[in-house]
């Protein structure tokens, strides 16, 4: 009995075809590099020819495996080592001069290169994520590039952000400490935003930043000792980006106002002394460059939110007048300008219109504030004549009619007495 292993049959004369995927994978990074460099050199400055070469070559080279090498060469002309140094810089046969970093430093040329990346990524969709990672990596390498190379990368990034090839979150690399400390992040951001705005507009840029929650991080482009609105505004305005300066100031003001409102609500609920609230608000105004017009409206909102109002119309007016009489000295401190007084009158009008139980309270609140020196005769007359809002204007103008007539008569009497003297 034969106990040995039975030999398996052997096929002869049969050739096995290597799958395309396996064919691609046999390429080493150096072979891949040489093929791409040669293709770029042959295309020269003809970017249409380059785009065509990349399209065709993707069917035989493994772009998926060597995506970082591909993008390194297209942007820097060579494979890059960590930090941004060129691996093959000594061997000119392994480097191409036909890349983004060696292109002319103008928007039109860089936009043409951006179109090459657009076509490539549309053709090979799987490269999308790899390209995002490449740009994030290159941003971290900025220190290793020349100023001109940084500028071209900034312009390319701006154009690609504008056309949607890159998502805004890739910009988080710019918040790296070593880039921020040396001023590279802020300088890069200015050039990038200019290219982005040139493709779209400032509103598109600020909208994209908001959606990516990057609007709150813009100050982090600067070192800690310069992370304030004043420095940001000066830097970006001088760079010709006033739209972004205004945007940041608005965002910071909104954020500050929310925090201020929250703190005021807390202090009012604890019934803190008015003088302490005044000191706190003045400090916040100075620290955050808040204008009186913004603060007076905020105070009114906080005061009206601090009370559980009676649902009966005949009782709520008395309740409101008692509450507002107590806090009139607080409002008076922050209504020293005609514009602030007008803002307050409009806020009162809006509140009384939106809260039906207060419809009949409007004129009584205004008279109370007039007597407490919160609003002046001039502000009331201005509101009455042409500065009132549309909301419930007929009702409120009718309520104020007798008081306005009284003010006018008092003024006329005062003038006639002056003439007699």
Swiss-Prot record:
Q: What is this protein called?
A: eIF5-mimic protein 1
Against PANTHER family, the record matches this protein to: BASIC LEUCINE ZIPPER AND W2 DOMAIN-CONTAINING PROTEIN, EIF5-MIMIC PROTEIN 1
This entry carries the following GO cellular component terms, namely:
cytoplasm
Major localization listed first in the record, in broad terms: cytoplasm
Q: Which organism is it from?
A: Danio rerio (Zebrafish)
Q: Signal peptide location in the record? A: none
Domain W2, residue spans:
250-417
Give the UniProt subcellular location, in the record's own words.
Cytoplasm
Q: Which GO terms describe its biological process?
A: regulation of translational initiation
Q: Which family does it belong to?
A: Belongs to the BZW family.
């Amino acid at each position: 009995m034969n106990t040995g292993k039975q030999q398996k049959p052997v096929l002869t004369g049969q050739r096995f075809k290597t799958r395309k995927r396996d064919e691609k994978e046999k390429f080493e990074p150096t072979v891949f590099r040489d093929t791409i460099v040669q293709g770029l050199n042959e295309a020269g400055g003809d970017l249409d020819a380059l785009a065509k070469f990349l399209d065709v070559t993707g069917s035989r080279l493994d772009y998926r495996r060597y995506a970082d090498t591909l993008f390194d060469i297209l942007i820097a002309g060579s494979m890059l080592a960590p930090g941004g140094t060129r691996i093959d810089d000594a061997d000119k046969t392994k480097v191409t001069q036909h890349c983004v970093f060696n292109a002319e430093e103008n928007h039109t040329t860089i936009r043409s290169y951006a179109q090459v990346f657009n076509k490539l990524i549309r053709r090979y969709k799987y490269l999308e994520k790899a390209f995002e990672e490449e740009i994030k990596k290159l941003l971290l390498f900025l220190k290793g590039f020349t100023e001109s190379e940084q500028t071209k990368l900034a312009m390319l990034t701006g154009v690609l952000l504008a056309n949607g090839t890159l998502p805004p979150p890739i910009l988080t690399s710019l918040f790296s400490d070593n880039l921020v400390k040396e001023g590279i992040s802020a300088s890069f951001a200015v050039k990038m935003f200019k290219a982005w705005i040139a493709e779209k507009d400032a509103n598109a840029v600020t909208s994209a930043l908001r959606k990516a929650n990057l609007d709150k991080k813009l100050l982090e482009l600067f070192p800690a000792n310069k992370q304030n609105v004043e420095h940001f505004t000066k830097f970006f305005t001088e760079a010709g980006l006033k739209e972004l300066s205004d945007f940041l100031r608005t965002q910071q003001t909104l954020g500050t106002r929310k925090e201020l409102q929250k703190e005021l609500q807390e202090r009012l609920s604890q019934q803190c002394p008015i003088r302490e609230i005044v000191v706190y608000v003045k400090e916040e105004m100075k620290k955050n460059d808040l204008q009186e017009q913004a603060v007076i409206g905020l105070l009114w909102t906080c005061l009206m939110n601090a009370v559980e109002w009676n649902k009966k119309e005949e009782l709520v007016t008395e309740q409101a007048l008692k509450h507002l009489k107590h806090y009139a000295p607080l409002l008076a401190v922050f209504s020293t300008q005609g514009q602030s007084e007008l803002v307050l009158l409009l806020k009162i009008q809006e509140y009384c219109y939106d809260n039906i139980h207060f419809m009949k309270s409007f004129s009584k609140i205004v008279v109370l504030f007039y007597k407490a020196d919160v609003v002046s005769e001039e502000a009331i007359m201005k509101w009455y004549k042409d500065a009132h809002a549309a909301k419930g204007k007929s009702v409120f103008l009718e309520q104020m009619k007798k008081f306005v007539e009284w003010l006018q008569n008092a003024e006329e009497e005062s003038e006639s007495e002056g003439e007699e003297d």
